[in-house]
């Protein structure tokens, strides 16, 4: 290694050349090898072993004469590569330790490094700077004094050298002081820390991994003489290190001295990472590093290039471009922003509360401050996606009438999800300043203050909000490196003619923020219109969704109030929700329907409870069914269906209450001859008693809730008491059994038990069990009332009649008159329209014919007779629905009501109460208590309920059988409105 190589190693930018001969250079190289071997064994041979920083400052002049050739040269490259640890050679250690001893050791290591890494010294010009040369004599005396302490030096140097083995030395300098275009300084700056190679790829003298970055401040300014003092360079180097350790930092506090790599990292953390970004910027400016700016492009074993070496020794002239201290600029920005008045970035009355994190730049009161945030919208909704023509719209009509309505692939979201979609960006729309007139376009959204997350008008996602600090000052500190990294490039781009401007104390380096309203931009108009169209579309979607929910609830209420088949209510609701694309679930209980509307967007559900008093209104049931079919087949919208449903619900009944009272008496008179064998006289009595029952039900019970709870018991008591009283009149031919049963026929629980049996048959266990049990208890109430009324009159009148059968029945041919009359009467009581009467009468008469003749053939078989009649009724009703598109339920119910009294009359179950009453009277009048009425009383009380169950089971089996024949695969588009 020659002198020129050592000069390049220390970053010397001079144009001088080595004037020595090759023989001299070879001799110096061999001398350096011998001297280094002696230095490794004995530290006393080092003339600078005890030289301290203070001694250098006091005894060495910047221009003192010194013979650089007297110092030994480092070993050759071949020796260092073959034996890296030759003669105890070790790297210096700069690990900080506490106390003066540690500082002295660091200084001694630095001086030894000068000795180990330096080449032949040259004697500088003593008069170059014009200072006193007498300091050289004092320096020589100090050297002689230091030689006398060889013993102590050897004791200290040996362990010290051992501790330096394996340590890395880094002479850190400011990267800004190195000109990347300098062919001499740039290779030194590009040398990677820890590689142990110089710019030519040769191994260093120690053979270990080390990074030696030499700082030569004067070489970048101008070309100097070849007699530059290198000892003065290291003197300044050590002075910077000592000044930097002071608390105030000194004048050269911005510069960095010789320190360890650990301390260098600590300083980078104190500066907020500015050193790291400066290194990244400098690496980008240096050699082409590709996509890894943190790694230097250094070849460990490049080939020697003579032309490159000659270029590196050339003199480079030019002025340094004084760079801006970006850290100080960033700190100044933070300081200036923090010193703004409170009203500049805070509201007097803060509008940014919990849940309201948006701000509108169009109003000064909502300007962004340190505490203002911009909340991210929901990621699962995109306004651009709503208006795309390629996707299906929520308002697209459902495909027309189909034979089958499968479960929808996509259902409409709930109201809550739609509201969230509509209002999630409500404040974002405020960021567009509203136009002051109709012809103005919305203004461009203003960008928040110094916030890179909000660039290009974008709103940060929820993940980026986690990194937003709580104040603008801390946010600026966090982004100071990014701001500083682009400051120099922006200044160079916009002001290429500026050179050597003052960076400190100048407000020109601070960015200016115009306090003006942004200009309007026409390019945001389509986006604004698009967003307004999306909001309008969501509004229409919400309105339509509410209409569909309301239609389902209105439909459910109408079906329950007007007597739809309870075992098919859930099926009707499911079909309706499928057609309307509503995620609905339904659970029916007697008198109550639980409706749940699901919302897949928010994973929530809206539960509605529909409760109403179940009744029977055949005409309104027909109207509700007509509306249902039109909506399901998509010939009517849900909003139009709601209008019609409201009209149906608000309409008055076709038959008023007082007419129903008279019809009650008429039906009682009509049912007495053909069902219970009464004669013509019994018709008048049954009419009178039936009218009383109708008055109790339609007038008294409707006005008193308390009485409605005991209506059945009170009516049975009154009918039994009055009927036995009329039957006890001598010679009147009034039949007690026919009058009593005919008057109570309209309040028999036939329909209730029928609905319960149908529900149980259709696997609706909850509703069917409840209704069936209620029907049994209801029958027991009636039986108890008949018994109590008959017993009361028997106690009052000793000669009360006990006859249960009429001795004078009417001819059976008159039944062809009474059955249609009873059908018309019961249909009018149940609010049937006159256009429905012909079908009802036809089906009812057909059913009774089957009952009459089957009863003649199968005696004492109530279940079988009712089953055959119900089967025929079901066949005719379902054919009417399938062929003539009518409502099967309304046509079949009057015929079923005709079957129930006939079945009950065949068993004479109502008169079991009379037998119980007679037993009670006989028991009280008997002395000695021989009678045992327990068994007969128990059988008489339960016989009526058992008879009702038998009739209902027979009707249920017949109805299901008829539905299976007419609709073997069921109705697919709509539910089967049949019993």
From Swiss-Prot:
Subcellular location: Membrane
Biased composition, class Polar residues, residue ranges: 77-86, 192-213, 503-515
GO MF entries: transmembrane transporter activity
Acidic residues bias spans: 54-68, 122-135, 379-395
Bias kind Low complexity: ranges: 29-38, 360-372
Entry keyword annotation includes Membrane: yes
Family: Belongs to the ThrE exporter (TC 2.A.79) family.
Protein name, per record: Pheromone-regulated membrane protein 10
Biological source species: Zygosaccharomyces rouxii (strain ATCC 2623 / CBS 732 / NBRC 1130 / NCYC 568 / NRRL Y-229)
């Amino acid at each position: 290694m020659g002198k020129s190589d050592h000069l390049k190693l220390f970053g010397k930018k001079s144009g001088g050349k080595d004037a020595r001969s090759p023989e001299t250079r070879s001799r110096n190289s061999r001398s350096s090898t011998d001297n280094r071997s002696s230095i490794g064994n004995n530290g006393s041979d080092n003339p600078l072993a005890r030289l301290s920083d203070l001694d250098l400052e006091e005894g060495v002049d910047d221009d003192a004469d010194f013979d650089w050739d007297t110092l030994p040269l480092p070993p050759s490259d071949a020796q260092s590569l073959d034996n890296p640890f030759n003669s105890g050679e070790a790297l210096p250690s700069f690990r900080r330790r506490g106390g003066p001893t540690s500082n002295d050791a660091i200084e001694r290591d630095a001086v030894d490094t000068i000795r180990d890494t330096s080449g032949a010294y040259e004697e500088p010009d003593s008069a170059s700077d014009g200072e006193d040369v007498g300091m050289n004599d004092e320096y020589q005396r100090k050297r002689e004094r230091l030689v006398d302490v060889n013993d102590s030096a050897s004791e200290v140097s040996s362990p010290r050298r051992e501790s330096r083995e394996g340590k890395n030395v880094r002479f850190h300098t400011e990267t800004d002081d190195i000109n990347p275009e300098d062919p001499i300084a740039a290779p030194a700056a590009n040398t990677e820390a820890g590689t142990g190679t110089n710019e030519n790829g040769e191994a260093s003298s120690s053979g270990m991994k080390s990074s030696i970055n030499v700082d030569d401040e004067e070489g970048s300014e101008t070309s100097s003489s070849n007699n530059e003092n290198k000892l003065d360079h290291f003197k300044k180097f050590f002075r910077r290190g000592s000044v930097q350790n002071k608390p105030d930092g000194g004048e050269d506090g911005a510069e960095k001295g010789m320190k360890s790599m650990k301390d260098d990292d600590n300083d980078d953390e104190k500066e907020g990472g500015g050193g790291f970004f400066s290194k990244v910027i400098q690496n980008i400016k240096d050699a082409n590093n590709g996509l890894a700016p943190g790694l230097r492009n250094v070849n460990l074993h490049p080939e020697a290039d003579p032309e490159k070496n000659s270029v590196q020794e050339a003199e480079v002239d030019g002025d340094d471009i004084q760079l801006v201290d970006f850290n100080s600029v960033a700190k100044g920005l933070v300081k200036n922003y923090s010193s703004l008045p409170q009203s500049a970035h805070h509201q007097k009355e803060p509008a940014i509360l919990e849940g309201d994190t948006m701000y509108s730049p169009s109003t000064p009161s909502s300007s962004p401050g340190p505490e203002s945030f911009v909340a991210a919208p929901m990621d699962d909704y995109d306004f651009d996606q709503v208006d795309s023509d390629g996707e299906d719209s929520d308002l697209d009509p459902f495909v027309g009438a189909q034979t089958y309505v499968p479960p929808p692939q996509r259902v409409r979201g709930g109201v809550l999800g739609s509201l969230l979609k509509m209002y999630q960006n409500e404040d974002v729309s405020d960021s567009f300043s509203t136009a002051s007139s109709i012809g103005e376009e919305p203004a461009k959204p203003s960008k928040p203050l110094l916030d890179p997350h909000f660039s290009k008008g974008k709103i940060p996602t929820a993940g980026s909000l986690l990194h937003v600090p709580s104040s603008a000052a801390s946010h600026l500190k966090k982004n100071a490196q990014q701001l500083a990294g682009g400051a120099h490039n922006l200044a160079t781009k916009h002001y290429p003619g500026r050179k050597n401007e003052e960076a400190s104390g100048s407000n020109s380096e601070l960015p200016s923020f115009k306090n003006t309203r942004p200009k309007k931009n026409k390019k945001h108009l389509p986006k604004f219109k698009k967003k307004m169209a999306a909001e309008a579309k969501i509004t229409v979607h919400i309105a339509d969704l509410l209409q569909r929910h309301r239609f389902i609830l209105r439909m459910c209420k109408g079906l329950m109030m007007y007597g739809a088949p309870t075992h098919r209510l859930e099926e009707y609701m499911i079909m309706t929700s499928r057609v309307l694309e509503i995620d609905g679930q339904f659970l029916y209980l007697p008198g109550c329907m639980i409706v749940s509307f699901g919302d897949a967007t928010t994973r929530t559900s809206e539960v509605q409870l529909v409760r109403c008093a179940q009744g029977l209104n055949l005409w309104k049931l027909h109207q509700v069914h007509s509306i249902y079919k039109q909506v399901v087949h998509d010939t009517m919208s849900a909003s139009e269906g709601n209008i019609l449903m409201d009209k149906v619900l608000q309409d008055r009944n076709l038959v008023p209450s007082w007419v129903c009272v008279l019809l009650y008496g008429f039906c009682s008179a009509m049912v007495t001859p053909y069902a219970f064998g009464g004669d013509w006289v019994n018709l008048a009595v049954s009419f009178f008693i039936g009218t009383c029952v109708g008055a109790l039900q339609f007038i008294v019970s409707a006005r008193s809730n308390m009485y409605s709870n005991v209506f059945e018991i009170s009516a049975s008591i009154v009918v039994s008491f009055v009927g036995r009283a009329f039957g006890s009149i001598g010679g009147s031919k009034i039949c007690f059994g026919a009058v009593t049963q005919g008057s109570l026929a309209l309040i028999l629980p036939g329909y209730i038990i029928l609905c319960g049996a149908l529900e149980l048959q259709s696997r609706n266990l909850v509703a069917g069990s409840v209704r069936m049990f209620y029907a049994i208890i209801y029958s027991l109430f009636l039986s108890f009332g008949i018994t109590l009324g008959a017993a009361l009159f028997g106690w009052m009148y000793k000669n009360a009649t006990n006859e249960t059968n009429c001795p004078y029945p009417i001819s059976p041919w008159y039944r062809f008159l009474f059955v249609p009359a009873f059908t018309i009467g019961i249909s009018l009581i149940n609010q049937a329209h006159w256009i429905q009467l012909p079908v009802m009468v036809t089906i009812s008469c057909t059913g009774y014919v089957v009952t009459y003749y089957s009863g003649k053939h199968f005696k004492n078989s109530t279940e079988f007779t009712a089953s055959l009649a119900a089967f025929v009724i079901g066949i005719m009703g379902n054919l009417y629905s399938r062929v003539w598109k009518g409502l099967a339920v309304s046509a079949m119910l009057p015929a079923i009501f005709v079957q129930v009294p006939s079945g009950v009359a065949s068993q004479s179950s109502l008169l079991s109460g009379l037998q119980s009453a007679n037993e009670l009277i006989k028991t009280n009048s008997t002395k000695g208590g021989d009678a045992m009425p327990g068994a007969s009383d128990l059988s008489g009380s339960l016989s009526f309920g058992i008879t009702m169950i038998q009739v209902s089971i027979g009707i249920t089996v017949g109805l299901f059988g008829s539905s299976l024949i007419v609709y073997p695969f069921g109705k697919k588009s709509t539910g089967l409105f049949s019993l």
